[in-house]
A protein has these predicted regions:
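Alpha-helical scaffold/interaction cores of sigma-54-like transcription cofactors
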Residues: 1-309
Length: 309
């Protein structure tokens, strides 16, 4: 069971009717110049919207969409640059009508089922890009709205990788740094490389391992520790929003900078049915925003990046 927080809707609405109102308004704005789109095209759009809304309601994700709509709306109202859409969420006309995404799924013939499949129950996952410098403002807003005790960032565990474990174990064994560093540099610069794979790939490394007893002992110790957690840090984007105080669902810890983070990783939080959101800080958005401001300040001409075809 997903533990979704409730979104506080205006008086006279429930979550379902408010989501429908927002989507109707968005459909008129996106496709009908302020009026509901008419004719055969209008009927096709309405059928697609009603289909998606039906799936969202049956799967119990109405409040999820309202929560995402709300913090994106806050960002846009406060001049915080927001990305046009990332990943499978761009295939949803509901997301497009709510201005969660800015990519027309009908024009580009995108599939809603890549995002939310009625035959496979899984949490929708809307990753949102924000200006790198102002991302924290959006997280702070979510904390104020739902309660800072209910909104916490997510831990991530750094593990002992091939080169790092050689240096760490070498230091514990009190071996000379230059000697240990030279061994670590024999590990090829390859993504997710393991010590066993490095020994296969580098004949010089393998020869040293086979002939030097000290190196053999060092690498054997490293193999036993390789892949184990080394340290904790804060996930670059993940934030969990709870129905009740977060400590009722997960253990928490305080980071070195004083921030509160979960002790469970993102995967475990999803298994518990908690709402995990990705607030991604994207430097590209900051650069584009600064460039648009610079052009306006120097030429007086305002460029709407979203209107560039």
């Amino acid at each position: 069971v997903t533990k979704l927080p409730k979104y506080d809707v205006p008086e006279g609405y429930d979550s379902w009717s408010y989501l429908n109102k927002l989507c109707d308004d968005g459909l008129a704005e996106r496709y009908g110049d302020g009026d509901q789109p008419a004719g055969e095209t209008g009927q096709t759009l309405r059928e697609r919207l009603d289909y998606e809304l039906g799936v969202i309601q049956r799967m119990g994700y109405v409040d999820y969409f309202l929560i995402v709509w709300d913090f994106i709306n806050y960002a846009k109202e406060h001049g915080i640059p927001v990305g046009p859409g990332r990943g499978s969420a761009a295939g949803s006309i509901v997301a497009y009508c709510l201005k969660i995404t800015n990519i027309d799924p009908i024009h580009y013939n995108l599939l809603f089922e890549r995002f939310l499949n009625p035959e496979r129950v899984s949490m929708p996952d809307i990753d949102v890009d924000f200006c790198f410098e102002r991302r924290q403002e959006v997280i702070d807003y979510v904390g104020r709205k739902y309660g800072n005790d209910k909104v916490v960032q997510i831990v991530t565990f750094g593990t002992l990788a091939a080169k790092g474990v050689i240096r760490d174990v070498g230091r514990v064994m009190d071996l000379p740094y230059a000697f240990v560093d030279s061994i670590a540099k024999m590990v090829p610069n390859e993504l997710n490389i393991t010590l066993s794979r490095a020994l296969e790939m580098n004949p010089e490394f393998r020869k040293l391992y086979q002939e030097d007893e000290q190196v053999h002992h060092l690498i054997d110790m490293c193999k036993r520790l390789e892949g184990l957690p080394r340290h904790t840090s804060m996930h670059a984007a993940g934030v969990v929003i709870c129905q009740k105080s977060a400590d009722e669902f997960v253990p928490l810890s305080r980071g070195s900078d004083g921030s509160i983070v979960t002790q469970f990783t993102m995967t475990t939080l999803e298994e518990l049915g908690l709402l995990k959101m990705d607030f991604l800080g994207l430097r590209t958005l900051t650069v584009i925003h600064d460039a648009v401001k610079f052009i306006e300040n120097t030429t007086g001409r305002h460029i709407d990046v979203d209107a560039i075809d």
